[in-house]
Protein backbone atom coordinates (compact mmCIF):
# COMPACT_ATOMS: atom_id res chain seq x y z
CA UNK A 1 0.00 0.00 0.00
CA UNK A 2 1.04 3.62 -0.36
CA UNK A 3 -0.11 7.07 0.67
CA UNK A 4 -1.01 10.18 -1.34
CA UNK A 5 1.56 10.81 -4.03
CA UNK A 6 3.17 7.41 -3.26
CA UNK A 7 5.57 8.99 -0.74
CA UNK A 8 5.21 6.29 1.94
CA UNK A 9 5.03 2.59 1.09
CA UNK A 10 4.28 -0.42 3.30
CA UNK A 11 3.55 -4.12 3.11
CA UNK A 12 -0.09 -4.93 3.86
CA UNK A 13 -1.71 -6.22 6.01
CA UNK A 14 1.42 -6.73 8.14
CA UNK A 15 3.55 -3.58 8.15
CA UNK A 16 7.20 -4.12 9.08
CA UNK A 17 8.76 -0.71 8.64
CA UNK A 18 7.82 2.92 9.10
CA UNK A 19 4.56 4.14 7.58
CA UNK A 20 3.08 7.59 8.26
CA UNK A 21 5.98 8.20 10.67
CA UNK A 22 4.89 5.26 12.87
CA UNK A 23 7.36 2.48 13.66
CA UNK A 24 5.72 -0.82 12.75
CA UNK A 25 9.04 -2.73 12.65
CA UNK A 26 7.72 -5.37 15.10
CA UNK A 27 5.21 -6.44 12.43
CA UNK A 28 1.78 -4.91 13.01
CA UNK A 29 -1.51 -5.83 11.32
CA UNK A 30 -2.46 -2.40 9.96
CA UNK A 31 -5.66 -3.78 8.46
CA UNK A 32 -7.08 -3.63 12.01
CA UNK A 33 -8.40 -0.19 13.01
CA UNK A 34 -7.27 -0.64 16.62
CA UNK A 35 -3.62 -0.98 15.50
CA UNK A 36 -3.40 2.33 13.61
CA UNK A 37 -2.62 5.26 15.94
CA UNK A 38 -2.54 8.13 13.43
CA UNK A 39 -4.67 9.37 10.51
CA UNK A 40 -3.71 7.09 7.64
CA UNK A 41 -4.49 6.45 3.97
CA UNK A 42 -3.99 3.07 2.32
CA UNK A 43 -4.00 2.94 -1.47
CA UNK A 44 -3.69 -0.45 -3.16
CA UNK A 45 -0.63 -0.99 -5.32
CA UNK A 46 -1.51 -2.62 -8.67
CA UNK A 47 -4.37 -4.76 -7.40
CA UNK A 48 -5.31 -7.70 -9.61
CA UNK A 49 -8.74 -7.94 -7.99
CA UNK A 50 -12.02 -6.36 -9.02
CA UNK A 51 -13.02 -5.50 -5.44
CA UNK A 52 -11.95 -3.61 -2.36
CA UNK A 53 -13.74 -3.45 0.95
CA UNK A 54 -13.89 -2.63 4.60
CA UNK A 55 -14.90 -5.06 7.36
CA UNK A 56 -15.99 -4.11 10.89
CA UNK A 57 -15.19 -6.99 13.26
CA UNK A 58 -17.36 -5.59 16.06
CA UNK A 59 -20.42 -5.19 13.82
CA UNK A 60 -19.90 -8.42 11.82
CA UNK A 61 -20.52 -6.49 8.62
CA UNK A 62 -18.79 -4.69 5.82
CA UNK A 63 -18.98 -2.88 2.51
CA UNK A 64 -17.45 -3.87 -0.82
CA UNK A 65 -16.84 -1.93 -4.01
CA UNK A 66 -16.75 -4.03 -7.19
CA UNK A 67 -15.50 -2.77 -10.58
CA UNK A 68 -13.19 -3.95 -13.36
CA UNK A 69 -9.67 -3.32 -11.99
CA UNK A 70 -8.39 -2.40 -15.46
CA UNK A 71 -10.82 0.55 -15.56
CA UNK A 72 -11.05 1.23 -11.81
CA UNK A 73 -7.55 0.75 -10.39
CA UNK A 74 -8.03 3.22 -7.53
CA UNK A 75 -8.63 1.53 -4.18
CA UNK A 76 -8.25 3.56 -1.00
CA UNK A 77 -9.20 3.42 2.66
CA UNK A 78 -8.84 6.39 5.03
CA UNK A 79 -8.97 6.30 8.82
CA UNK A 80 -8.52 8.99 11.45
CA UNK A 81 -6.63 6.39 13.52
CA UNK A 82 -7.37 4.88 16.90
CA UNK A 83 -5.70 7.53 19.09
CA UNK A 84 -7.64 9.96 21.26
CA UNK A 85 -7.60 12.41 18.33
CA UNK A 86 -8.99 9.79 15.93
CA UNK A 87 -11.65 8.63 18.36
CA UNK A 88 -12.85 12.23 18.73
CA UNK A 89 -13.41 12.28 14.95
CA UNK A 90 -15.12 8.87 15.14
CA UNK A 91 -17.56 10.30 17.67
CA UNK A 92 -18.23 13.40 15.56
CA UNK A 93 -18.65 11.62 12.22
CA UNK A 94 -20.65 8.50 13.10
CA UNK A 95 -24.07 7.77 14.55
CA UNK A 96 -22.73 5.33 17.13
CA UNK A 97 -19.26 6.77 17.87
CA UNK A 98 -17.16 4.88 15.35
CA UNK A 99 -15.01 3.51 14.07
CA UNK A 100 -15.06 5.79 11.04
CA UNK A 101 -13.39 4.92 7.74
CA UNK A 102 -13.78 6.20 4.22
CA UNK A 103 -13.72 3.71 1.37
CA UNK A 104 -12.75 5.51 -1.85
CA UNK A 105 -12.39 4.23 -5.38
CA UNK A 106 -11.02 5.70 -8.55
CA UNK A 107 -11.89 5.26 -12.18
CA UNK A 108 -9.01 5.63 -14.68
CA UNK A 109 -6.43 6.64 -11.99
CA UNK A 110 -4.74 4.76 -9.14
CA UNK A 111 -3.93 7.62 -6.77
CA UNK A 112 -5.92 10.55 -5.44
CA UNK A 113 -3.53 13.31 -6.63
CA UNK A 114 -3.60 11.87 -10.16
CA UNK A 115 -6.13 13.29 -12.58
CA UNK A 116 -7.59 11.95 -15.79
CA UNK A 117 -9.15 14.50 -18.07
CA UNK A 118 -11.97 14.25 -20.56
CA UNK A 119 -11.54 15.98 -23.89
CA UNK A 120 -14.38 18.01 -25.35
CA UNK A 121 -17.19 15.65 -26.42
CA UNK A 122 -15.27 12.65 -25.08
CA UNK A 123 -17.25 10.00 -23.25
CA UNK A 124 -16.07 7.26 -20.89
CA UNK A 125 -18.36 4.60 -19.52
CA UNK A 126 -17.95 2.25 -16.61
CA UNK A 127 -19.93 0.19 -14.15
CA UNK A 128 -19.29 -0.08 -10.44
CA UNK A 129 -21.21 -1.64 -7.57
CA UNK A 130 -21.31 -1.15 -3.82
CA UNK A 131 -22.37 -4.23 -1.86
CA UNK A 132 -23.05 -4.49 1.86
CA UNK A 133 -22.26 -7.91 3.33
CA UNK A 134 -22.30 -9.64 6.71
CA UNK A 135 -21.32 -12.77 8.66
CA UNK A 136 -18.36 -13.70 6.42
CA UNK A 137 -15.46 -11.71 7.83
CA UNK A 138 -12.67 -10.63 5.53
CA UNK A 139 -13.33 -12.11 2.09
CA UNK A 140 -11.02 -13.42 -0.63
CA UNK A 141 -13.01 -12.44 -3.70
CA UNK A 142 -16.13 -10.64 -4.81
CA UNK A 143 -18.05 -9.88 -7.97
CA UNK A 144 -21.33 -8.13 -8.65
CA UNK A 145 -22.97 -11.57 -8.26
CA UNK A 146 -21.43 -12.96 -5.06
CA UNK A 147 -18.99 -12.54 -2.17
CA UNK A 148 -16.72 -15.51 -1.36
CA UNK A 149 -14.64 -16.47 1.67
CA UNK A 150 -12.34 -19.47 1.98
CA UNK A 151 -10.18 -19.95 5.05
CA UNK A 152 -7.63 -22.65 5.89
CA UNK A 153 -7.03 -23.66 9.51
CA UNK A 154 -5.57 -26.66 11.34
CA UNK A 155 -9.03 -28.24 11.24
CA UNK A 156 -9.29 -27.93 7.45
CA UNK A 157 -11.04 -25.57 5.05
CA UNK A 158 -14.08 -23.49 5.85
CA UNK A 159 -15.83 -20.89 3.84
CA UNK A 160 -18.94 -19.09 2.89
CA UNK A 161 -20.67 -17.38 0.02
CA UNK A 162 -23.19 -14.58 -0.08
CA UNK A 163 -24.99 -13.95 -3.38
CA UNK A 164 -25.96 -10.43 -4.34
CA UNK A 165 -29.62 -9.49 -4.56
CA UNK A 166 -29.58 -8.47 -8.21
Task: State the predicted function of each range.
Residues 1, 128, 150:
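Acidic, contiguous internal or C-terminal segments within carbohydrate-active enzymes
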Residues 1-123, 131:
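A contiguous, surface-exposed recognition patch within enzymatic or periplasmic domains that forms
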Residues 124-139:
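A general sequence property marking short-to-moderate contiguous segments
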Residues 135-165:
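Surface beta-strand/loop "capping" patches
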Residues 122-126, 155-157:
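Residues at beta-strand starts and edge strands
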Amino acid sequence: VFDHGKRAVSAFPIATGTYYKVDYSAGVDISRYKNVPVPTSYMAEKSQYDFVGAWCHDEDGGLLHVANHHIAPGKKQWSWGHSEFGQAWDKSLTDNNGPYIELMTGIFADNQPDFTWLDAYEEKRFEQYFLPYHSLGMVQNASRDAVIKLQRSKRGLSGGCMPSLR
